[in-house]
From Swiss-Prot:
Record key words, sorted: Cytoplasm, Pentose shunt, Schiff base, Transferase
Active site: 83 (schiff-base intermediate with substrate)
Name assigned to this protein: Probable transaldolase
Pfam families the record matches: TAL_FSA (PF00923)
Entry coiled-coil feature ranges: none
Family designation: Belongs to the transaldolase family. Type 3B subfamily.
Primary residence: cytoplasm
């Protein structure tokens, strides 16, 4: 399973990328707005930190604008993935991007039917929003399982990128449900390293080692 970081915070990205565990990055207009920086500059800097896919979202809602913005974003770096909303216009743009060899991440997916259309349009990634579905009383993980079954039935190449991840349990459940990737907020990514029994066990080992008076070096 590939793990992407959902952030535009370059300092945080550098820190976590140093672990060698970050396979890519996703961004969105909300994260760009919070950064207070120029979008193209942020995307270019992120692409210089990670070699994997970096999703950058178009702001337009009509096909013409999405195509123009997507082409400009794709020109920033070879690892840019153009992120488009799962709308009729977005899927028309996705088909054109596919024909042009531009990778796409179709976002805001809330149903398996939508995911089917995105795959038929040639999307590189589909982003089902797990946490937001849970907020509305649905089971976000059920959606991943449904998409996985459909994609496997018809040998679609589109990868399932679990989004709107809120907890480390979401990451585990998405992996079990067959997601190819998950995009994770920095705080949740940090939480993946931790378990109270790991810390407790480490402290015990260190205490026992100290009693030996030995040094490995």
């Amino acid at each position: 399973m590939q793990l992407f970081l959902d952030t535009t915070d370059v300092a945080v990205l550098k820190d976590l990328a140093a672990t060698g565990l970050v396979d890519g990055v996703t961004t969105n207009p909300s994260l760009i707005a919070k950064s207070g920086r120029n979008m193209l500059e942020v995307i270019a800097e992120i692409c210089g930190i990670v070699e994997g896919p970096v999703s950058a979202e178009v702001a337009g809602t009509d096909v013409h604008t999405m195509l123009a913005e997507g082409r400009k974003l794709a020109g920033v770096a070879p690892n840019v993935v153009v992120k488009v909303p799962l709308t009729r216009e977005g899927l028309i743009a996705t088909s054109e991007f596919c024909a042009e060899g531009i990778q796409t991440n179709v976002t805001l997916c809330f149903s398996a039917a939508q995911a089917l259309l995105a795959a038929k349009a040639g999307a590189t990634y589909i982003s089902p929003f797990i946490g937001r579905l849970d907020d509305h009383g649905a089971e976000g993980m059920d959606l991943i399982s449904e998409i996985r079954a459909i994609y496997d039935n018809y040998d679609f190449d589109t990868e399932i990128l679990a989004a709107s991840i809120r907890t480390s349990a979401h990451v585990k459940e998405a992996a079990l449900a067959g997601a190819d990737c998950a995009t994770i907020p920095p705080d949740v990514f940090q939480a993946l390293f931790k378990h109270p029994l790991t810390e407790k066990g480490l402290q015990q080992f260190l205490a026992d080692w100290a009693k030996t008076g030995q040094s490995i070096l």
